[in-house]
Each structure stands twice: as C-alpha cells, then as structure tokens.
C-alpha cells in the first residue's frame, strides 16, 4: 500500500487517537494561549463525536506556572521548576475544563510518573482507569507529575510519555502537534531552504543529529525527541502524524485528507505490547556487550543471549533489571531483562553452560536474557 493510501486509511479508521501538544504550541511569553486551547478542545471534541476515542497529552504546566509567578518569584533549579508546575498545572487544567465544557465534553486530569508505568500492577491499574474514562466519553488530559517526579523516574519529556501511553490505552494513531510545519529534510536553523518531508519510511535511516535542532526554549524536547517517540510508536505498529500545531483547524484539516505535516510509517514487524512494556518501562541500568556471533544469533536467528556471547559488562544492576545489549562496535541492538546481576555476569561472561554451573552452582539460568524478555532494535 502506498503511504498516501495508508495515511488516509489510518486517519479514517483509527479507534483511539493519542494527541500530544507541546509548550511551544500552547504558551506564549505571557502565559497560556487560551485561543489555542479552545481550538484544540473544539477539534478533539469533533474527533470524539466522529466515533474515535481521544487522549490528550499536554505540556504547559511549568510555563503556565512561570507566567503566574513572574512578578513575585525567581524560578531557578529543579525544586523551583517542580513548584512552578504545581502552580501552573491547576491553571492549565482549569482552562481545559472550561474549553471542553463549551463543546459539551468532560475532561479528566491524569498525572503520571515513569514509576506508574514500569510497575506492572500500577500499569494495569492505569490502563483500567483510562478504559473507564474512555468508556464514559471523557477526554483524559495527561501530563507528567513534575511536582513529585525525581530525575530517575522522569519520562524525560512528554513525547516519551505519549509513546508509552500508546501501550496503556491501546492507541492506534499518534498525532504530535509541534511548533514546526513538520519534519524538515535538513536542519532549518542552518539550512533555510530545507523542505518538509511528507513521509518517513523508517526513522532509523535518518541522521537525526544533522536534521534536528536543539531543544525549544519553553519545552524539554525538540524534533529529535519527537522522532524518537515516533520510532517507538512504529515498533508497536502505530503510525505518527507530526503536525504544525499553531495552524488553524490543523487536526480537522488533517483528518479531512489535507496533506499537511509529516507521516511516519509503522514498522512491518510489530512487537507485542508486553515486550514494548518490558523495553520501555524504565531506563536501562547497564550495558552488556556481546561478540559478533552472539549479535548475529540475536538479530538474525531470534535467539536468547547466552553467557558465552558476553564479552563486557558495564553499570551496576540486580537480577531482573533492564539492560542494553550492544554489539562489538558499541551499537545498541536490543534491550532486555537480565537474569543476572552485574557481579555474577562479570564472573560468567564468555563461559559455556557447564562452566557457569561450576562457577555459580546449580541455581543459575541458561540464558543471560531470554528472547521472550528482549526487544531488538529498541530505541533507548
């Protein structure tokens, strides 16, 4: 199927759409742009009325808090930023509640940390809550809980949060509203003549360092993080549409068939939702470097990682931790759950199965990472 036909069909047939909007679209130097919020509420309400489930991931709390506190407080450092988020989140949600009510819809605030999604029980509880809200016709407005999140439990940015949320709500279309017109073929900051890519077949083939500029002044992620999120979505079989969020009626125009923005195609080889959860539940705790034979067995034969193929171990981690698996050249080829902690793995690396038994005793696993607990070509 041609990508234009694929795009038209996906927009038409999507059942659950996750829409992410960034601070650069939502806010100005003086605070929240109420006209943008009203337009967004109108378009999302129309999408829901067309029979689609809608989940909104919205940045803007910190920026809204900065605006409210501008005349009385100087915001410097993480504690101040988290406090500004607490001030801004309530104001941001108030604006959304009022805007959706004007179009006859209820909205609900959902604040998450990465720990909420990496713990399997809490992940399933979050899924049940979202399903109840969507069954009721309520539009969830999701943001990272910046006020309580510590650095190691942060998503990093809301692009990452949205890509993980696709797995929670079983989304089948991801729309990212940005301050750019789409994805440029080159860095527009250094090449003003760079044009918009209408379609990206595979994010892995792009030179992201060349194409993408730095982070925006009000948000936490630039186009680089948006493409990483799109690549993660593609692994789930979910296409991404990156749109210019500041343009009038942009969602309405896109869903009506206007060829705006950049379409990122899903991968043909889709991973299971369980493997996706395993891979992206948290940041990897360490790296296991393997030899060429082991890398070939993983990538070409779908095998598990055995102790004999391990040639180096870095980082401190316990059994059951998520680790990167790197090839001989250092390129990450997979992530997975290690059956061994770093100390035992250092002892058994390069050894055959019978040698492992002699080193560790009978209580050992034949695999370092079982293929069922591994995701190849993960974007980490």
From Swiss-Prot:
One of its GO terms (cellular component) is cytosol. It catalyses: L-glutamate + ATP = L-glutamyl 5-phosphate + ADP. Residues 285-363 form the PUA domain. Its EC number is 2.7.2.11. Substrate binds at residues 59, 146, 158. SUPFAM superfamilies: Carbamate kinase-like, PUA domain-like. Pathway: Amino-acid biosynthesis; L-proline biosynthesis; L-glutamate 5-semialdehyde from L-glutamate: step 1/2. CDD domains: AAK_G5K_ProB, PUA_G5K. InterPro entries: AceGlu_kinase-like_sf (IPR036393), Asp/Glu/Uridylate_kinase (IPR001048), G5K_ProB (IPR041739), Glu/AcGlu_kinase (IPR001057), Glu_5kinase (IPR011529), Glu_5kinase/COase_Synthase (IPR005715), Glutamate_5-kinase_CS (IPR019797), PUA (IPR002478). GO terms for molecular function: ATP binding; glutamate 5-kinase activity; RNA binding. Keywords: Amino-acid biosynthesis, ATP-binding, Cytoplasm, Kinase, Nucleotide-binding, Proline biosynthesis, Transferase. Its main location: cytoplasm. Coiled coil: none annotated. It is found in: Cytoplasm. Gene3D superfamilies: Acetylglutamate kinase-like, PUA domain. Pfam families: AA_kinase (PF00696), PUA (PF01472). ATP binds at residues 20, 220-226. GO terms for biological process: L-proline biosynthetic process. PROSITE patterns: GLUTAMATE_5_KINASE, PUA. Transmembrane segments: none annotated. Catalyzes the transfer of a phosphate group to glutamate to form L-glutamate 5-phosphate. Belongs to the glutamate 5-kinase family. This is Glutamate 5-kinase. It comes from Nitratidesulfovibrio vulgaris (strain ATCC 29579 / DSM 644 / CCUG 34227 / NCIMB 8303 / VKM B-1760 / Hildenborough) (Desulfovibrio vulgaris).
């Amino acid at each position: 199927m041609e990508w234009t036909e694929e795009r038209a069909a996906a927009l038409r047939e999507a059942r659950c759409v996750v829409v992410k909007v960034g601070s650069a679209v939502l806010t100005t130097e003086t605070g929240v742009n109420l006209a943008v919020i009203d337009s967004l509420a109108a378009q999302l309400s129309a999408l829901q009325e067309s029979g689609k489930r809608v989940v909104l991931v919205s940045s803007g709390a910190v920026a809204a808090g900065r605006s409210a506190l501008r005349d009385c407080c100087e915001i410097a450092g993480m504690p101040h930023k988290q406090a500004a988020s607490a001030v801004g989140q309530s104001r941001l949600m108030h604006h959304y509640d009022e805007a959706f009510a004007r179009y006859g819809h209820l909205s609900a605030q959902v604040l998450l940390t990465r720990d909420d999604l990496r713990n399997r029980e809490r992940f399933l509880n979050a899924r049940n809550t979202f399903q109840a809200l969507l069954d009721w016709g309520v539009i969830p407005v999701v943001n990272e809980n910046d006020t309580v999140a510590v650095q190691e439990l942060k998503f990093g940015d809301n692009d990452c949060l949205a890509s993980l949320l696709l797995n929670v709500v079983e989304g089948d279309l991801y729309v990212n509203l940005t301050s750019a017109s789409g994805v440029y073929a080159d860095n527009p900051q250094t090449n003003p003549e760079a044009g918009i890519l209408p379609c990206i077949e595979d994010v892995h083939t792009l030179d992201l360092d060349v194409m993408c500029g730095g982070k925006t002044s009000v948000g936490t992620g630039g186009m680089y993080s948006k493409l990483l999120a799109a690549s993660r979505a593609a692994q789930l079989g979910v296409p991404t549409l990156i749109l210019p969020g500041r343009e009038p009626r942009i969602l309405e125009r896109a869903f009506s068939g206007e060829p705006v923005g950049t379409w990122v195609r899903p991968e043909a080889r889709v991973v299971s939702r369980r493997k996706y959860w395993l891979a992206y539940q948290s940041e990897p705790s360490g790296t296991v470097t393997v030899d060429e034979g082991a890398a070939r067995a993983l990538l070409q034969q779908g095998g598990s990682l055995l102790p004999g193929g391990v040639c180096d171990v870095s980082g401190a981690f316990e059994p059951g931790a998520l680790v990167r698996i790197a090839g001989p050249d250092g390129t990450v080829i997979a992530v997975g759950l290690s059956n061994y902690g770093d100390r035992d793995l250092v002892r058994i690396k390069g050894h055959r199965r019978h040698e492992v038994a002699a080193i560790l005793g009978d209580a050992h696993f034949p695999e370092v990472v079982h293929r069922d607990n591994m995701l190849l070509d993960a974007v980490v």
